[in-house]
Amino acid sequence: MKLLPAQPFRLKTVPVAVCLFVAVLALRLYGLANLTESLFLLPSAGDMHFYDDWALRILRGNWTDHMAFYGLPLYAYLLAAIYWVCGHNPFVPAFLQACLDAGTAVLLYKLGAAVFATSAGEKSLSDSAPRGKIIGLLAAIGWACFQPAQGYSIILMPTAWLVFVFWFVVWQIVKRQQAPSLWTLALMGVLMGFTAMGIATILFLVPLLLAALFLRWKGAAARRLAGAGIVIAGVFLGASPAWIHNYFIARDPVFLSAHSGVNFWIGNNPVATGYPKFPPGLHAGQEAMLKDSITSAEKAMGRPLKRSEVAAFWSEKARAWIRAHPGDFVRLLGTKFKNFWSAFSYDDISVITALRDQSIILLGLGFGLVAALGLPGLLFAWWRIPGSRWVGAAVLLHMASLLTVFVTERYRLAAVPGLLLFAAFGVYELWRNLSTQRYRLAGIFLLLLFGSTAFVSMPQKDPTLWALDTYNSGLQALEAKNFSLARRKLELAYAYSPENAEINFAQGNLHLATGDVTAAKRFYLGALRLDPTHAGAYNNLGVLALEEKRWPLAGNFFRHALEYAPNDSKTHYLLARAELNSGNLANARKEIARAIQLDPRHPEFFALQKEIETTKPDQR
């Protein structure tokens, strides 16, 4: 048998998209490998812990609490499925997200090639590399180096999933010159509906798909109407696990999640800044905020509420403020618009700073540079390349979804791939205009670039915003018992914003952990002066009073804490102990019974109940 000669491997035979995927995945895996050797792989607090804890509850068989979802459920159930197959290991979902993020880079390359393809009679800078592919490659490289994408692709957050699906749908629209089949439209609707159970802003792409049906693709009116109906039906079908659970298991008319009401209030209230500044009565952190929002609504209404009623309560507060202050609302929208494009990074969970400080992710691009280049590129492309308007519309629709609530670094991340395409186009066109001596066009672009740079660089004057990263970094150091780093970070946060209740509370926790009880009390009282509803400060002051055997004072602090957090089982337990030591056995029995009713998993609750039952009135 005659053997064929071996063919040497040539790199140029490997598609660019494959090389891109492998290169970006390697960068993300570098960050993930560093993450596995750090304290940040297993979340202990914040939004990441919220999802991780929810997934673990599902694994234990707590599929539902028979109430409407109060938090979008998809990511928690997805984590639970991964944990069920692979065990409780955050590495696996992070690896999948790294793959998706590499896929986003490939989508950028393909979008660039499709949208910015060299038109007839137009010459590219390189005969061997058409304009569209160069722009797509530049945008993909920008995405690989974009620092927030590096961070959010490897932690337990659903952001990478949204970004990939968002731009996959845009690519499906842009790459087609003819209307897709009804079956394809149905699948796209299902995909958007399913993804909305994780991040609801994907639904702002539905109008883009419907617009493509009527404006981009030709077809009979009846077929267009049928396609629109199928897309909408697909969205409802994709989201059906959420609304079926809410309507038929919880018997509560909620489409996806009832927490949309409190988000609307946080974004539209008298003290709103366009960022998630929590009004009095609500505390930072997803889990704490959700609990506070239910407790505050029920206290205001004087009765237990369904989740839909909680959502309606907060939505009506926001709408009432908007009706009463239309001028302030318009100014707030302008502030949100400015915040969306600002170079200032409001990373509400401070993951980017933490990962960068620990050298887990590489130094890279920030939003400010991308926005400064992307805005003039968007204007030029909108003018010269009609196909790019679909990409621009996707960016603007995503921005519109945030104007209804508030802006954070992770929320605006889905707009970055589109801005990178426009930034790459702008740089490409600037170089081409300079090389071909089209100085007028180059000058116009540079003038727009100067204006966009000035716009995105407008300073943030609120010192509390500058305190966010140092505050969150201080909390992370405190949880890791790195008290010297925690002190340095929290003191800097306090210097930025001494009148912030949460920073005062964190300072109290730091001084308590380091044994300075007097300073801890001072900061807890400072937190209560700034926020009289701060249940955590009341609780910790009660614990200190217990340790000092000042039983009546401890009881008073715990009762105040329960006014604002009535379903906290630990506080009921501590109040029962204070009442027992004060000799109020009847109250002690009532409080420990309530603690056990709320959370029967704690053996110390039953031990205290037994101690109360065996205590005679004259023994105290």
Question: Where do the protein language model's features map onto the residues?
Answer:
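Transmembrane-helix motifs of polytopic, lipid-linked glycan transferases
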Residues: 95-122, 168, 172, 372-376
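Extracytoplasmic catalytic/substrate-binding loops of multi-pass membrane glycan-assembly enzymes
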Residues: 34-52, 65-78, 87-91, 253-258, ...
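Membrane-proximal stem/loop segments at transmembrane-domain junctions that anchor or position
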Residues: 255-336
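Transmembrane-helix signature of polytopic, membrane-embedded enzymes
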Residues: 19-20, 108-145, 163-164, 183, ...
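Membrane-interface anchor segments at the N-terminal boundary of transmembrane helices
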Residues: 92, 320-391
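Start-transfer (signal-anchor) and selected internal transmembrane alpha helices
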Residues: 1-33, 113, 223-234
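Multi-pass, polyprenyl lipid-linked donor-dependent membrane glycosyltransferases
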Residues: 43, 70, 74-75, 92-103, ...
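Short hydrophobic alpha-helices at membrane interfaces in multi-pass membrane enzymes
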Residues: 129, 134-137, 172-193, 222-229, ...
